[in-house]
Every structure is written in structure tokens, then in C-alpha cells.
Amino acid sequence: MLTHEISENEKPREKLQNYGIEALSSSELVALIIETGTKNESVLTIANRIIMKFKNVGEMQYASIEEFQLVNGIGIAKASKIMAAIELGRRISIVTEQEEVVVRCPEDAVKLVMPELAFLFQEHFHCLFLNTKNQVIYRQTIFVGGLNASIVHPREVFRLALRKSAASIMCFHNHPSGDPTPSSEDLLVTKRLAEAGNIVGITLLDHIIIGKNKYISLKEKGYF
């Protein structure tokens, strides 16, 4: 059934206007994002095909742009729109009133960063900046790419910490392989960060490696 053959009440846009966004199915939401069908297929047919490709809607957040393009009827433009919508939703989901977040243990911090780091395809080096009450006052990804001592410069980390008047920091990076076991480079970077923190008076509370649904705290393991 082509788009022009669908009754006005069944079209996703009209359904949203009449009944609200909550009334739309996942396929209808995807149809709104990709906007158009093809010469031979309606936008809803293509949207249904996208939903059926994945086990559930949540799995879509881990798909690459190439995986979306494997769906018949999805080119680079439509795939880009889907990726943008997913990324926007991800960013919204991790927004918190950071000044009210208190980190009492590694698990508290991991809950903040795991959704953002666990399934990335590249290594990201991320920092939480805390005040004297261990409240998160700022967070930022500092580096993207392979973690090694030549890329991760303590001065970049602590320059930002000083600018934010942080009393301490917690560092994180992900292993795209899903295995959080630290490498020799991970340990070297951690040692350099801890030493730099001692010099400037800003404590490195922990360096946590994020894997797929698991993590390793280098502080808890006694690496520094």
C-alpha cells in the first residue's frame, strides 16, 4: 500500500496530531523520521522492515549507519536521519542535574557513563569532575581514539579540571572489544594522570575501564 492510499487518520503525522506522540507505534515513529517511501513501497512498509531487522527497538542504538543501509529502501540520507534521532535520544537520556549527582563508589560513576560509553566503536576517554562533596560538577569526553600515552596528555585533563575548580576527577575509557581488562598503556596513562594530579592538588579518584555490561576499577584493583 502506497502512502497516498493510506487514510488520513492512519498516516503517522496525522495520527500524532490527533492522538499524541504516545499513540504511535515504533514503526510509525521511524516513518516520521525517514519521511518518504520509494516508488514501489510506502514509508510505513520500509519502517516496518527496519523494526523487523532488529530484535527490539533498543537494539537499534547499537547499529551502524552501514547496517541501516542494508535495509531495502534505506540509503545514506534516511540512515543518517535515523542515526541522528538515536543519538539525540541518547544525549537526552544522559542529561542529569549534575550538581546533585554524588559519587560514593565506582558503581555510582559507572551508572552515569556506561550508557554513553559501553557500545561505542572507538575508544573514548571521558572524565567526571567533582567538587569537595564528590558531587559531579562537569563531565566531558576529552579524547577519541586509541588510548596511549602519546595521545592522553594530563595537561589537557587537568587544565579543564582547574578551569572547573574541581577538587577531584574520575576518568573512564571504553574498550570496544567489550573486554575491560587493562592494557599496559592503560596502566601507564593512569600512572601519569595520578602523578600529575598530585602535583596540581587534584586527586585522581579512579580510572575505570568500560566493557560491554561490565567494568574494571583500576583503583579497586590496586593499580595506583
From Swiss-Prot:
GO molecular function terms here? metal ion binding; metallopeptidase activity
| Start and end residues of each MPN domain | 102-224
Question: One Pfam family, short name please?
Answer: UPF0758_N
Q: Which InterPro entries match?
A: MPN, RadC_JAB, RuvA_2-like, UPF0758, UPF0758_CS, UPF0758_N
- Which biological processes are named by the entry's GO terms? proteolysis
Which residues are Zn(2+)-binding? H173, H175, D186
Motif JAMM motif, chain ranges: 173-186
Question: Which keywords annotate this record?
Answer: Hydrolase, Metal-binding, Metalloprotease, Protease, Zinc
Is Protease one of the keywords?
A: yes
KW Iron (keyword) present: no
Q: Which NCBIfam families match?
A: PRK00024.1, radc
- What family does this chain come from, according to its entry? Belongs to the UPF0758 family.
Q: Which protein, by its recorded name, is this? A: UPF0758 protein lmo1549
Q: Which organism is it from?
A: Listeria monocytogenes serovar 1/2a (strain ATCC BAA-679 / EGD-e)
